[in-house]
Amino acid sequence: MMRRSKRGFTLVELIVVIAIIGVLAAIVVPTALHFVNEGKIEAAESDCSTILRTLEINIGRLAVGTSYTLDGAQVAQILNTYLGGDPAEETYVSIVTADNVSYTLSVTSPVQKDGVDISYQRTYTPQSILTVVPCVVVFRNGTWA
């Protein structure tokens, strides 16, 4: 009598392999997603810090004693000219005047950390005669406006 050779896998073997793959996926996928989210948060924090530094440097270049008006158009021009890279869509910069002497720059990203939008702000007292017009500038479709 001739014996037939077995070919393929049994149903039990297939179920065991599928179960092992499922367990591995349950462990690996959440960990990978965590690292992706952490990367987005770090990128948004870096973008906010870079935007503040870019504005600080370029506003600080104004000659002492000169008169200058800083408004939304000027902020957009500075960011479009000197800022490399693209922040998250809908990142925005706002300028608020505290008094006639100082102003506060605030950069906010739509990326959230612990359920709150990432936001950096600094208050400045300019050395030049600076007139600050409160404004909001938003990054949309690859440009600041």
Give the predicted meaning of each segment.
Residues 1-9:
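N-terminal leader/signal peptides at the extreme start of proteins
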Residues 33-52:
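Aliphatic-rich helix starts adjacent to a transmembrane/signal segment
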Residues 15-31:
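Alpha-helical hydrophobic helix detector
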Residues 1-2, 14, 35-38:
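Amphipathic alpha-helical segments that mediate coupling or scaffolding at interfaces
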Residues 47-66:
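N-terminal alpha-helical signal peptides/signal-anchor transmembrane segments
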Residues 8-11, 23-26, 35:
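ABC ATPase nucleotide-binding domain "signature" loop
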Residues 63-135, 140-145:
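Extracellular/periplasmic head regions of type IV pilus-like filament subunits
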